[in-house]
């Protein structure tokens, strides 16, 4: 179940607000300029789908976003607990960073935790299957895939080069709850 928990940057252990209601989550995030929507990830992808299979299954969703925002490229990120690079990838994504473009993800399997550092608050968004999130360009954030990752998401970019991060050097992520 998708969830949003809001913390003060001054008190990372006690939440200010929490909800698992998709409409409430959407309202809170939209107020901060973050797009959050529930889409349908209802295609049968099989046991170990290739990136091509995932893209073909959800080309209609990609086309919708391209038509709306003019995105130029897309790919698929799929990580499982047996990935030999899972620890290195988790550490990389857990470092607060920004992008020069919106970070758009459509989760078609599993879950991951986006943590957005907006002003004096941190918004932890548990994204699961059916969730579309678009983090605005230049928003400091980090992503936690958990110690045993299990997710597949379509990533959509303005930049044809794909995922390019500018790390902030702030260790804020270490103070907040993580996925197990």
Swiss-Prot record:
Q: Which residues bind Ni(2+)?
A: 97, 99, 103, 141
Q: How is the cofactor bound?
A: Binds 1 Fe(2+) ion per monomer. Can be replaced by Mg(2+), but with lower activity. Binds 1 nickel ion per monomer. Can be replaced by manganese or cobalt ions.
Its UniProt entry gives the catalysed reaction(s) as:
1,2-dihydroxy-5-(methylsulfanyl)pent-1-en-3-one + O2 = 3-(methylsulfanyl)propanoate + CO + formate + 2 H(+); 1,2-dihydroxy-5-(methylsulfanyl)pent-1-en-3-one + O2 = 4-methylsulfanyl-2-oxobutanoate + formate + 2 H(+)
Species of origin reads Klebsiella oxytoca
Cofactors, names only? Fe(2+); Mg(2+); Ni(2+); Mn(2+)
State the protein's purpose.
Catalyzes 2 different reactions between oxygen and the acireductone 1,2-dihydroxy-3-keto-5-methylthiopentene (DHK-MTPene) depending upon the metal bound in the active site. Fe-containing acireductone dioxygenase (Fe-ARD) produces formate and 2-keto-4-methylthiobutyrate (KMTB), the alpha-ketoacid precursor of methionine in the methionine recycle pathway. Ni-containing acireductone dioxygenase (Ni-ARD) produces methylthiopropionate, carbon monoxide and formate, and does not lie on the methionine recycle pathway.
CDD domains assigned to the protein according to its UniProt record, in alphabetical order: cupin_ARD
The record places the site described as Important to generate the dianion at 105
Q: Which HAMAP family match?
A: Salvage_MtnD (MF_01682)
Q: What metabolic or biological pathway is this protein involved in?
A: Amino-acid biosynthesis; L-methionine biosynthesis via salvage pathway; L-methionine from S-methyl-5-thio-alpha-D-ribose 1-phosphate: step 5/6
Q: How does it assemble?
A: Monomer.
Family stated for the protein in its record:
Belongs to the acireductone dioxygenase (ARD) family.
Mutagenesis or variant effect for residue 103 to A: Loss of dioxygenase activity and strong decrease in expression of soluble protein
Protein's name according to its UniProt entry: Acireductone dioxygenase
Q: What is the effect of changing residue 101 to A?
A: Strong decrease in dioxygenase activity. Exhibits high affinity for both Ni(2+) and Fe(2+) ions, but the activities of both Ni(2+)- and Fe(2+)-reconstituted mutant are considerably lower than wild-type enzymes
């Amino acid at each position: 179940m998708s969830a949003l928990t809001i913390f003060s940057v001054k008190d990372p252990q006690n939440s200010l607000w929490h909800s698992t209601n998709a409409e409430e989550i959407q309202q809170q995030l939209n107020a901060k300029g973050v797009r959050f929507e529930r889409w349908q990830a209802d295609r049968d992808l099989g046991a170990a789908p290739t990136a091509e299979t995932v893209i073909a299954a959800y080309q209609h969703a990609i086309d919708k976003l391209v038509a709306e925002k003019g995105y130029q490229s897309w790919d698929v990120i799929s990580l499982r607990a047996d990935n030999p690079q899972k620890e290195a990838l988790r550490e990389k994504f857990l470092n607060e960073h920004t992008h020069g473009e919106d970070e758009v993800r459509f989760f078609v399997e599993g879950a991951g935790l986006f943590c957005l550092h907006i002003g004096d608050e941190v918004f932890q968004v548990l994204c699961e299957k059916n969730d579309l999130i678009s983090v605005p360009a230049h928003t400091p954030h980090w992503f936690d895939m958990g110690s045993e990752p299990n997710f597949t998401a379509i990533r959509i970019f303005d930049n044809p080069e794909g995922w390019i991060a500018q790390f902030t050097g702030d260790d804020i992520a270490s103070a907040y709850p993580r996925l197990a």
